[in-house]
Amino acid sequence: MTSGKNGITYAEAGVDIDAGNALVDRIKPAAKRTNRPGVASGLGGFGALFDLKAAGYQDPVLVAATDGVGTKLRIAIDTGLVDGVGIDLVAMCVNDLVCQGAEPLFFLDYFATGKLETDTAARIIEGIAEGCVQSGCALIGGETAEMPGMYPAGDFDLAGFAVGAMERGTALPEGVVEGDVLLGLASNGVHSNGYSLVRKLVEISGNTWESDCPFGDGKLGQALLTPTRLYVRQVLAAIRAGGVHALAHITGGGLTENLPRVLPEGMGATIDLDTWDLPPVFGWMAETGGIAEAEMLKTFNCGIGMIVVCAADRAEALAELLSAEGETVARIGTVTTTPGIAYTGKLL
């Protein structure tokens, strides 16, 4: 057995345990900010504990979701603007959870890189914590994997895992009928899907991340890194108010493919494209790439990040409630008995 001053260390193989420990110490205050009723352990254990009774549940059903941020990370890595991608990660998971009618309870992250850069990792995880605070769920654990030889210098990847709960018998979708109203909640841009196409369009346009933004203020890279909106608190308030029959998070697949996922078999919807304002980024992308309207609608959110399907006699009250919660709400269509999505009006 080799020992003494000539022995090889783990650090010499590319894994810095001390850096990992320093990261945990730095992010503990951020994680602590996310504590909520039900959290029964802190960071550092072999597992994290959560007490559903302490969270107020009597007969809970658990709901789980996992997701990533996709190639939006490439822009964050190239620009060094990593602070918002943690919010993206949380949003992609918890916005899905709430579509089942569940309240997000806790979140875990997976951060992988070739060489751990403590400041970069801390900024990302602090963003994750901010996303958790905004959506009312606790950051109760995670994994930081330093894997030499697996990633180019400076690169990293992220995955998130969220668990929520609802009382038995309250799951969505439920009760969707012909004539139900579609309330569209505004997005703030591209959110976190379609970025392989976005990056191709930037290349075609001859711009760089440091170019002045052609569709708004500031630099192009910064504009494209606007964090995904979190809809959890607002939508949960609408669910509790009554009349919500289904929710659709508009991510990959756009309006065309995501709304049918929450409609009963044999049903569809009409959507009036003239009922909301298209964020400028989508017009720029369509023009730059000569992208057809139908392709835009099945790729991007096109300005609607979440659809609330509700009873017609509750639509006005729910729109007012959601507006009071800070949402920009548009009445964009209705449920029909014709399968698929039929569009009227003009997007572009």
Swiss-Prot record:
Predominant location: cytoplasm
Pfam families from the UniProt entry: AIRS (PF00586), AIRS_C (PF02769)
Reaction(s) catalysed (UniProt annotation): 2-formamido-N(1)-(5-O-phospho-beta-D-ribosyl)acetamidine + ATP = 5-amino-1-(5-phospho-beta-D-ribosyl)imidazole + ADP + phosphate + H(+)
Annotated compartments: Cytoplasm
MF-aspect GO terms: ATP binding; phosphoribosylamine-glycine ligase activity; phosphoribosylformylglycinamidine cyclo-ligase activity
Keywords noted in UniProt: ATP-binding, Cytoplasm, Ligase, Nucleotide-binding, Purine biosynthesis
Enzyme Commission number: 6.3.3.1
One GO cellular component term: cytosol
Biological process per Gene Ontology, one example term: 'de novo' IMP biosynthetic process
Pathway: Purine metabolism; IMP biosynthesis via de novo pathway; 5-amino-1-(5-phospho-D-ribosyl)imidazole from N(2)-formyl-N(1)-(5-phospho-D-ribosyl)glycinamide: step 2/2
Protein family (similarity comment): Belongs to the AIR synthase family.
Name of the protein in its database record: Phosphoribosylformylglycinamidine cyclo-ligase
Recorded name of the encoding gene: purM
